[in-house]
């Protein structure tokens, strides 16, 4: 077969061990954030045609605003965004917020009101665009830039609006009786609780206030007692029949009961059922078939029933008995004497139907609607006298007013589902029918029908993403604004104003600022590496406003629930107080329009699994039988086994294959991104997998990233979606490449309005939020063809477009002199020497020159009393050079501050006059390197206030920036020219010219030779005979001119921004930021980990020659403790070790063949081996079809080790590992003989050796080590501060004091508690004594003792210290008191 395919070497090729084909594509990993915010802003939608959601819905809900008299109205028309003033990069550098100005079109309508009739007519309409503050925009990577730092808004999980039924689990009452309750939770508005008490009376509560009988609530809705009873109960009619009663025969009500007395047919008088017999469904059916219509009943059987209607004398209007009254010996004669021979009775048997509502009605003191409304009013507004109008208005506002009460679409959908209603989701308030349905359902629950709700089911919890959180916040801002607008409309002459004059946008802007700046859900982005960024954006938090609190959250909320499957990861959650409250979205999960998390499934049609994918939420999939993704299938897609393991209604079961409706899409759909990156996850204990997923997020980007030999296939997805690696926006040819940018000439998706050139700026040594280094490196060379979506540059922690958090290290599992006790890690010096685990960290230092009362501070090189040596790294402006190597105490920016004038003696004045000595007026406040930090200056930024003269350094930085912009413009212009003139020459060629440049002969046919005689700029002068061609040329000229001017305009705008002064905090004249790159080699005390939760601290770095070595002389890099595996049950690391060993062995084999090919030129053996080991390329294409050059490239890539992918729950098994080891020519045991580096002797037993992917975590000893001699003290207690950040001391705590007491070290202890801590006078004396060379000193009273005395005095206790002196005999003599 012809080798047609080529491989460019820019992608990592992995051998794939997965057996299950991927049917569904994984959604973009940061879609959650982007989709939600796009839906909120709707920037792309036309201003007039936006649907009512997001920002549009907020404006619609607050506007129109009417003034108090109704004489004028302010209407909302539409809104639009202007382009942002600064782009993302400029905002990062200048500490600004990336936002776009929001302009809202408002219409002010003024009415004329006829004083007699009150009729309104429009007098005046004014429309105007009003600026409503800036709205932060989301960057392409799903983050926000607020004051120059990247932030992420975490999505919140909260209880969905709707109705919930629950019981108290028998906790409220000593008998353990279950008290049922229903709660209607709106999106905003009052909560309604309906609950039973221990006496089975039903009560209602509004907003957790005092309870009222539920019948009062129903009366307030306009029902009377009879209507309430007829709504909740059916009726039977008892008809007088001689001395007994005739009752309709109701088989359904009698099912399962015992006949108390004989049952007699009312028509025939025969006994149909004996007393004491059980009424089975079969018996009742037989009676019905025999034609039994009615039974005969006695008065005794009528007693205890309740009347269904009032017993009224219609002539006189006298009410004998009311509906709901009990029939007994006293009341029955009253009914009969009044001449009633038919009595309607409520069907209450106290077994299937309880008398709860009837009893509540009987216990309710309120008789009618007015009483009920007044009662509710008193509960809601205690102390205010109710009137009918105010009570009615308040009751309506509670649940029936769309302004105050909003169920939201979600709430309505949930209510419909739970109560079997069919109401459109536009009805957002409660209805009378809803409340009745809730009470009915609650009573049925009490009667033993139906199930209560599970609050932790994901069908009852929903996600509020950025857009929705922002919408709620903006609504609050607008409501604050609304009050101000109403007041202003009433107080101002409305005829003369424009909408602009009524609006003060500050409250709205402040609400937005407050949300992004200080909301609990707005977090500083975790930017240690690309994985931590992605995970942060996919996080779901149950905390935050309107959510839970750590203290109140119980075990159930935190636990894994069956509905989490495929929606929320059961593994990834923090250890500690937040466990289970902060979760991560599963890989394939997405959030639907109602905020419920959906998971994808494959449809099964006629027993065959199809590739059709449906997304279902937890409410929807409970009714299906769902098979697992790894169920065995036949070739036609049917199930191979008769019974299939499946999930149904939260249980795992075996079901016949015909019952299965759906199947999982992928085995990794149940875990999160971080957990899906752990190979052999299925072989690890869940607790260790949790640590593994959490620790991958803390891996520091290394100097040289290296993708893992043993991956899972998720690595490239994470690198692409996180935005760390740069993907081409459209196809084209690489025109220029250097370390800072890539220029690509586009060849597809060419749009005349867009530039034909894509310039990608690479980030070089930028600081991330966690001080790690963000650095991008190009992967393409000039002339490369690039397709859309190809990776063209690697970022931090990526390697050929794969996530690369650590390095592959050769590991041996064995003890080594006790240096791997308690999970310690022993490293070889080679790792330090070759910079294997070296990382770069970037620290930012900032200094401001302010305008003080005594005069302005100055940034300068001229600093008093500082040697020239200390200034060696500063330029003439007093700012450090880029590239200077600095150490603790070095000056980075020289700064002097004026100090207060101290009175001068006449002699000093004379000297000052003679020598002009000025230096004593200022003090040195330069910024110096903090202790323990060494590094190299990589960047300096200087910011000046508007109108402040720029120094030489600022000018130089500005010139450099403008040159960079000019180079971009010139390159783009050059490519544009080349393309346009190439098209022009094609258009002109072969045509007869009727005009041309000077000296051109008319009528000549144009050829390449003729045209190229003239300079390019003169080609436009040619005019051709053919009108159509001439028209095309003129169109091209117009397009070219437009592109050129657009390019120039863009350049001018950017230059203007660079030259403009910066916005500074008040009082700041100038600010300098210095970035220092610190190289951190690995050293003892650093924390390292594998991907399986196997973490440890480096205990020692051993010379290479002392490390154990293999038979071929290779020394191992890392020695781990074998005891760390069995008890922790993370066997995945051992399988990874073996597979990594096979990969490296295979790589060696391929390397040897590659060398042989370079010598002999025969590529066949190399091709066969690579095809056998890897099989297919990055897009699944067979390697057989690669050309020779591609095979060599691939061999070069796999030389260090073959990369493989073993997806979670569908990866390599033991047999695969053995096969790989055999192919690589290694022992199947995975063990090798090791030799001791110190003696050269072989160890007694064989040792497991292989490659593990090790990570260096962001817990570096350099950041933690800390020492203090003198430093700051706390103001009140005068004790040293604590912590490295405050340059504090070590705490000598209670237990340490016990230790010194136990040793009897009295003087040491006294020092610790006094002079070394808070005895102010004592510490000064100690210092003086040491200076004198004397070592005697006396401890005084600790300051904290004085604080205690003062605190006791503040409690009104008189505490005095008595001065007394011990005389020679040991008795105390009273001293005279010290002078007060």
Curated annotation (Swiss-Prot):
The keyword Nucleotidyltransferase applies. Its EC number is 2.7.7.6. Keywords: DNA-directed RNA polymerase, Nucleotidyltransferase, Transcription, Transferase. GO terms for molecular function: DNA binding; DNA-directed RNA polymerase activity; ribonucleoside binding. It catalyses: RNA(n) + a ribonucleoside 5'-triphosphate = RNA(n+1) + diphosphate. It comes from the Bacteria. This is DNA-directed RNA polymerase subunit beta. The gene is rpoB.
């Amino acid at each position: 077969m012809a080798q047609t395919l080529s491989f460019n070497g820019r992608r990592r090729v992995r051998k794939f061990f997965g057996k299950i084909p991927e049917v569904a594509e994984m959604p973009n990993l940061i879609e959650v954030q982007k989709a939600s915010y796009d839906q909120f802003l709707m920037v792309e939608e036309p201003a007039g045609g936006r649907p009512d959601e997001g920002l549009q819905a907020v404006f619609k809900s607050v506007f129109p605003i009417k003034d108090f008299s109704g004489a004028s109205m302010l209407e909302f028309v539409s809104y639009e965004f202007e382009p942002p003033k600064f782009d993302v990069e400029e905002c990062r550098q200048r500490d600004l917020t990336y936002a776009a100005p929001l302009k809202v079109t408002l219409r002010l309508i003024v009415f004329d009101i006829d004083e007699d009739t009150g009729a309104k007519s429009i007098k005046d309409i004014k429309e105007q665009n009003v600026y409503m503050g800036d709205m932060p925009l989301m960057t392409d990577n799903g983050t926000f830039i607020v004051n120059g730092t990247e932030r992420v808004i975490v999505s919140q999980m909260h209880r969905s609006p709707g109705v919930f039924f629950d019981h108290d689990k028998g906790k409220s009452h000593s008998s353990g009786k279950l008290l049922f309750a229903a709660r209607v939770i709106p999106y905003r508005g009052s909560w309604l609780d309906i609950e039973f008490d221990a006496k089975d009376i039903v009560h209602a509560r509004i907003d957790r206030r005092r309870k009222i009988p539920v019948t009062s609530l129903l009366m307030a809705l306009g029902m009377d007692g009879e209507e309430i009873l007829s709504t909740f109960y059916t009726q039977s009619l008892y008809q007088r029949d001689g001395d007994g009663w005739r009752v309709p025969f109701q088989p359904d009500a009698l099912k399962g009961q015992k006949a108390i007395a004989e049952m007699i047919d009312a028509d025939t008088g025969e006994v149909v059922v004996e007393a004491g017999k059980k009424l089975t469904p079969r018996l009742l059916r037989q009676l019905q078939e025999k034609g039994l219509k009615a039974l005969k009943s006695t008065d005794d059987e009528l007693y205890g029933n309740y009347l269904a209607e009032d017993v009224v004398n219609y002539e006189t209007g006298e009410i004998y008995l009311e509906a709901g009254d009990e029939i007994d010996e006293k009341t029955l004669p009253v009914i009969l004497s009044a001449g009633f021979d038919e009595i309607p009775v409520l069907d209450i048997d106290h077994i299937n139907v309880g008398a709860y509502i009837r009893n509540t009605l009987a216990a309710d003191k309120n008789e009618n609607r007015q009483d009920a409304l007044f009662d509710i009013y008193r509960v809601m507004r205690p102390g205010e006298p109710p009137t009918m109008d105010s009570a009615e208005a308040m009751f309506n506002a509670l649940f029936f007013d769309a302004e105050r009460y909003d169920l939201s679409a979600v709430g309505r959908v949930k209510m419909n589902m739970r109560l079997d209603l069919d109401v459109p989701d536009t009805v957002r308030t409660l209805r009378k029918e809803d409340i009745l349905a809730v009470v009915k359902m609650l009573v049925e629950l009490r009667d033993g029908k139906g199930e209560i709700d599970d609050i932790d089911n994901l069908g009852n919890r929903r996600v509020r993403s950025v857009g929705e959180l922002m919408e709620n916040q903006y609504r609050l801002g607008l409501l604050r604004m609304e009050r101000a607008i109403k007041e202003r409309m009433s107080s101002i002459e409305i005829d003369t104003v424009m909408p602009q004059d009524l609006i003060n946008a500050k409250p709205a802007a402040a609400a937005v600022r407050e949300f992004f700046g200080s909301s609990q859900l707005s977090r500083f982005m975790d930017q240690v590496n690309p994985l931590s960024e992605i995970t942060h954006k996919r996080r779901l938090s149950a905390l935050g406003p309107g959510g839970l609190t750590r203290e109140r959250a119980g075990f159930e909320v935190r636990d894994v629930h069956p509905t989490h499957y495929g929606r929320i990861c059961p593994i990834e959650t923090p250890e500690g107080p937040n466990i289970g409250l902060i979760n991560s979205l599963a890989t394939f999960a997405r959030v639907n329009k109602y905020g419920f998390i959906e998971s994808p499934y494959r449809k099964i049609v006629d027993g065959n699994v199809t590739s059709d994918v449906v997304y279902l939420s937890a409410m929807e999939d409970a009714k299906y039988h769902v098979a697992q993704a790894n169920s065995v299938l036949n070739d036609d897609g049917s199930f191979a086994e008769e019974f299939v393991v499946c999930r149904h209604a939260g249980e795992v079961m075996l079901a016949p294959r015909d019952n299965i409706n759906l199947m999982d899409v992928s085995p990794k759909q149940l875990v999160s991104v971080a957990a899906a990156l752990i190979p052999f996850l299925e072989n690890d204990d869940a607790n260790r997998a949790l640590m593994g997923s959490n620790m991958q997020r803390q891996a520091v980007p290394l100097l040289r990233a290296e993708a893992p030999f043993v991956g899972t296939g998720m690595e490239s997805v994470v690198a692409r979606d996180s935005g760390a690696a740069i993907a081409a926006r459209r196809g084209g040819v690489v025109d220029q490449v250097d370390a800072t940018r890539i220029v690509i000439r586009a060849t597809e998706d060419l749009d005349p309005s867009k530039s034909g050139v894509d310039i990608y700026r690479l980030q070089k040594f930028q600081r991330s939020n966690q001080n790690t280094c963000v650095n991008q490196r190009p992967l393409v060379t000039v002339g490369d063809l690039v397709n859309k979506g190809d990776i063209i540059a690697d970022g931090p922690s990526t390697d050929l477009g794969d996530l690369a958090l650590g390095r592959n290290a050769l590991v041996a599992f064995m003890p080594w002199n006790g240096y791997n006790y308690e999970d310690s890690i022993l490293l070889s010096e080679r790792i330090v020497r070759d910079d294997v685990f070296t990382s770069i960290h970037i620290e930012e230092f900032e200094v401001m020159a302010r305008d003080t009362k005594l005069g302005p501070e100055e940034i300068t090189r001229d600093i008093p009393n500082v040697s020239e040596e200390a200034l060696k790294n500063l330029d003439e402006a007093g700012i450090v050079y880029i590239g200077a190597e600095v150490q603790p105490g070095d000056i980075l920016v020289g700064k002097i501050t004026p100090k207060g004038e101290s009175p001068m003696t006449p002699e000093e004045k004379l000297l000052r006059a003679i020598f002009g000595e000025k230096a004593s007026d200022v003090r040195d406040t330069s910024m110096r390197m903090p202790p323990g930090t060494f590094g190299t200056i990589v960047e300096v930024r200087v910011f000046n206030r508007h109108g402040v003269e720029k120094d030489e350094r600022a000018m130089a930085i500005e010139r450099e920036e403008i040159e960079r912009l000019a180079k971009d413009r010139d390159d783009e212009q050059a490519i544009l020219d080349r393309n346009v003139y190439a098209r022009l020459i094609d258009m002109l060629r072969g045509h007869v010219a009727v005009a041309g440049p000077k000296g051109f002969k008319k009528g000549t046919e144009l050829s390449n030779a003729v045209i190229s005689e003239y300079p390019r700029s003169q080609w436009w002068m040619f005019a051709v005979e053919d009108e159509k061609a001439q028209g095309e040329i003129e169109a091209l000229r117009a397009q070219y001119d437009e592109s050129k001017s657009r390019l120039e305009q863009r350049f001018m705008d950017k230059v203007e921004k660079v030259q403009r002064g910066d916005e500074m905090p008040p009082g700041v004249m100038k600010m300098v930021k210095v970035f220092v790159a610190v190289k951190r080699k690995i050293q003892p005390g650093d924390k390292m980990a594998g991907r399986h939760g196997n973490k440890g601290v480096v205990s020692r770095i051993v010379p290479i020659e002392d490390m154990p070595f293999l038979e071929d002389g290779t020394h191992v890099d890392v020695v781990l403790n074998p005891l760390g595996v069995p008890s922790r049950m993370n066997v995945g690391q051992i399988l990874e070790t073996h597979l990594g060993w096979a990969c490296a062995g295979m790589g060696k084999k391929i390397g040897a063949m590659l060398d042989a090919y370079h010598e002999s030129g025969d590529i066949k053996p190399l091709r066969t081996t690579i095809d056998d080991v890897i099989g297919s390329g990055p897009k699944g294409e067979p390697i057989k079809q690669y050309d020779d050059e591609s095979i060599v490239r691939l061999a070069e890539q796999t030389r260090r080790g073959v990369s493989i992918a073993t997806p979670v729950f569908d990866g390599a098994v033991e047999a695969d590992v053995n096969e790989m080891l055999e192919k690589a020519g290694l022992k199947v045991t995975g063990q090798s003989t090791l030799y001791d580096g110190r003696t050269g002797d072989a160890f007694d037993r064989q040792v497991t050796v292989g490659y593990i992917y090790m990570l260096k975590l962001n817990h570096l000893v350099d950041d933690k080590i800390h020492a203090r001699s003198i430093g700051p003290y706390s103001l009140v207690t005068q004790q040293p501060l604590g912590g490295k950040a405050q340059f504090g001391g070590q705490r000598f705590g209670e237990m340490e004091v016990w230790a010194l007491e136990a040793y009897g070290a009295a003087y040491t202890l006294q020092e610790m508690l006094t002079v070394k801590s808070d005895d102010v006078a004592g510490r000064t004396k100690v210092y003086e004594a040491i200076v004198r060379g004397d070592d005697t000193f006396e401890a005084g009273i600790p300051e904290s003792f004085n604080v205690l005395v003062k605190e006791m005095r503040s409690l009104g206790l008189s505490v005095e210290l008595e001065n007394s002196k011990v005389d020679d005999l040991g008795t105390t003599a009273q001293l005279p008191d010290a002078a007060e």
